[in-house]
């Protein structure tokens, strides 16, 4: 089955979304909004299946509560097409939803998922079974629009009954999407890196050296250096995109993330993140990895689609608790995927911090911070007695390696401290000396402190 739809088919998807919104505006339903057009691409790149549904129903105007995803095809794709069905169900699972709809203008089918992740048909609509071709879609437009309204009204009843469940965008990001990005792209990027290294001895030597120092971190997870590095690339891009969208409502410099589109290259994306860093710092989160631009187009479009999804799905309107869930979810995925075997458990970190610190007014340094569990706990403990600003500014952290610092920096941030500069930097602990100059940038002004 062709994955990237043509312009004609895309226009019908957009029409379907527009008509759905018209129906919703004329009724008072649990379903409040329809969207999804921003993640539909017409690029012909041999791309994998899209990550997100063609049409998404939302439970609020801000589009932060997701109700259901629809997959849309034209009548020349049979409603019983297995790939069509599986694609819709896969996306429902990725969005943590228990239902999905497939629609080909001839038929519409509602699937429901049970606790064992098994889907079954809950309802099928056959009213427009006489629509058999793309030409018929235009001829009988008023007919399928009438059916669409009937479906929306029926779906409202299913949601009222509790039979169909929703998902909150914050939980979806924290629990599902980043893991999905890794599963979809790790092997593809790994193979691309391997082929590129065959023609580039500098790249080959760099990954060899990187693997020598970090192999032990992956020994229970990855035995292939290219797959390990590919996983780091996926997490790095995902974390940068996620964090930029999280802070853009508080940091105007991060609004540059909205410039991402299907014409943006990885190199141009890195330039955008450099501009964001210049305006609001968070260098350890937004800085690029070496060779992270060596990524196939089919994988790169996943990151663009993810950014578009965040751009248009209510992340600006999440409350502090939801934003904190996203931050903590990103941390958990990063630790689990990269060095979960060696991450300090939070309870142990609390004990170590309390055993090590005599006066909580003192400045604290963790010079081998890894993914930041210990400095995070130090900040949380300090905040019980000190202001958030005093707590953050008196806890320092560094590590020899770059990627853990991205996770550590996210780990040390809470929704109430986004405007405060973390004292975190890359440095080898054994060469760290009193008097070394460390540059910290104010995230509000972009000026050096």
List each language-model region with its residue ranges:
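Acidic-basic catalytic patches of nuclease active cores, encompassing PD-(D/E)XK
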Residues: 1-44, 352
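Alpha-solenoid helical-repeat scaffolds
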Residues: 3-6, 10, 232, 316, ...
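Membrane-embedded glycan transfer/ligation machinery
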Residues: 10, 14, 243, 320, ...
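Long, charged, glycine-rich C-terminal linkers/tails
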Residues: 25-48, 346, 368, 422-429
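Charged, often flexible domain-edge or linker segments that flank or initiate folded functional domains
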Residues: 53, 58-60, 64-72, 77-89, ...
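Class I S-adenosyl-L-methionine
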Residues: 250, 280-355
């Amino acid at each position: 089955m062709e994955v990237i739809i043509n312009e004609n088919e895309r226009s019908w998807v957009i029409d379907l979304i527009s008509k759905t919104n018209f129906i919703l505006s004329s009724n008072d339903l649990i379903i409040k909004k329809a969207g999804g057009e921003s993640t539909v691409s017409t690029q012909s790149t041999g791309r994998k299946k899209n990550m997100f549904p063609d049409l998404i129903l939302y439970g609020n105007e801000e589009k932060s509560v997701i109700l259901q995803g629809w997959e849309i095809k034209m009548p020349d794709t049979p409603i019983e097409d297995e790939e069509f069905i599986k694609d819709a169900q896969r996306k429902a699972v990725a969005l943590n939803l228990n239902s999905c709809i497939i629609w080909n203008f001839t038929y519409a089918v509602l699937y429901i998922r049970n606790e064992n992740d098994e889907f079954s048909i809950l309802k099928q609509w056959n009213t427009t079974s006489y629509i058999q071709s793309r030409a018929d879609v235009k001829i009988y437009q008023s007919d399928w629009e009438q059916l669409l309204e009937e479906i929306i009204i029926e779906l409202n009843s299913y949601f009222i009954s509790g039979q169909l469940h929703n998902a909150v965008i914050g939980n979806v990001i924290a629990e599902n999407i980043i893991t999905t990005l890794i599963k979809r792209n790790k092997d593809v990027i790994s193979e691309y890196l391997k082929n590129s290294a065959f023609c580039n001895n500098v790249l080959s030597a760099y990954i060899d050296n990187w693997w020598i120092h970090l192999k032990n971190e992956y020994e229970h997870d990855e035995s292939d250096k290219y797959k390990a590095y590919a996983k780091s690339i996926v997490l790095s891009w995902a974390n940068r995109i996620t964090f930029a969208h999280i802070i853009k409502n508080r940091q105007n410099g991060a609004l540059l993330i909205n410039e991402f589109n299907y014409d943006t290259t990885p190199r141009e994306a890195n330039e955008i993140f450099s501009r964001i860093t210049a305006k609001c710092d968070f260098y350890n989160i937004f800085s690029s990895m070496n060779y992270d631009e060596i990524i196939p187009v089919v994988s790169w479009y996943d990151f663009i689609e993810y950014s578009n999804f965040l751009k248009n799905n209510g992340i600006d309107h999440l409350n502090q608790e939801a934003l904190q869930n996203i931050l903590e979810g990103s941390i958990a995925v990063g630790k689990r995927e990269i060095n979960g075997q060696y991450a300090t458990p939070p309870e142990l970190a609390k004990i170590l911090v309390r055993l090590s610190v005599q006066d909580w007014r003192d400045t604290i340094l963790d010079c081998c911070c890894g993914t930041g569990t210990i400095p995070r706990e130090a900040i949380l403990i300090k905040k019980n007695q000190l202001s958030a600003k005093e707590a953050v500014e008196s806890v320092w952290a560094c590590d020899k390696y770059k990627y853990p610092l991205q996770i550590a920096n996210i780990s040390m941030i809470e929704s109430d401290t986004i405007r405060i500069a973390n004292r975190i930097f890359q440095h080898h602990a054994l060469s760290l000396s009193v008097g070394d100059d460390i540059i910290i940038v104010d995230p509000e002004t972009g000026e050096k402190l």
